Regions:
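Short, glycine/acidic-rich beta->alpha junctions
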Residues: 12-14, 99-103, 211
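C-terminal beta-signal and terminal closure region of outer-membrane beta-barrel proteins
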Residues: 205-211
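Transmembrane beta-barrel wall of Gram-negative outer-membrane proteins
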Residues: 1-57
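C-terminal outer-membrane beta-barrel translocator/porin domains of Gram-negative envelope proteins
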Residues: 44-190, 194-198, 202-204
Length: 211
């Protein structure tokens, strides 16, 4: 159960979820995952909310299936120095008061530039769209985590409805990293790295005037 009570931002949201997932190696380095999830979403708006946000208030239930594939060619899982990992995941509605389809694609590539420098390039894109004219609920909209867009607070990038950041139908991020594992003595137990992040969250299907 997740409670996202933000009366100062115009809404209070409680989300209860349960699910089962399994993952297995379909072929060498190619993994598949299957899952089933059920959720109950209780969204309440306050007087501070915009009229368009108030229209989204209510109780919503859903049962969704998800599947995905992951091609993992990294030389090791923890702190890789070579190889790549590519993944795709999709969520499909089985039953939902407001149906949606979500797609997520991510790719990372690692290479050791020198003995003391490991480069990483990462790409992420995610989209969620309503089905049959339904609008995507607030709890299902896309945000970027602080790992994908560092230096910004989570949930503070993207479309705003009045003063409220409501997330988008689309999110994308591109990251460049340089890890310097041998810069400091091992006794310090400190990792040093450089990064450059680009990201964006956009799209508000329930109100085309929102940017």
């Amino acid at each position: 159960s997740t409670s996202n009570d933000k009366p100062d931002q115009g809404y209070e949201n409680t989300l209860v979820t349960a699910g089962v997932n399994t993952s297995f190696e379909q072929y060498q380095d190619l993994f598949a995952n299957l899952g089933l999830s059920a959720s109950y979403d209780d969204l309440r708006t306050t007087g501070a909310a915009s009229d368009s946000l108030k229209k989204q208030s209510g109780d919503f239930s859903e049962l969704a299936g998800n599947y995905g594939f992951r091609l993992d060619k990294r030389n090791r899982t923890f702190m890789p120095t070579d190889g790549s990992i590519i993944s795709f995941n999709q969520v499909l509605p089985i039953y939902a008061d407001k149906s949606y389809i979500a797609n997520t694609f991510a790719a990372s590539n690692y290479n050791q530039f020198t003995e003391n420098v490991v480069n990483a390039t990462k790409f992420y894109v995610s989209a969620v769209n309503g089905v049959g004219g339904d609008h995507v609920r607030l709890s299902k909209r896309r945000f970027l985590s602080t790992k994908r867009l560092r230096g910004f607070k989570r949930g503070k990038v993207g479309p705003r409805d009045g003063l409220d950041h409501v997330g988008g139908n689309y999110a994308a991020a591109l990251n460049f990293e340089a890890n310097l594992p041998n810069l400091l003595p091992e006794a310090t137990k400190t990792d040093v790295g450089l990064f450059l992040d680009f990201g964006n969250v956009w799209g508000a299907d329930y109100d085309s005037s929102i940017e």
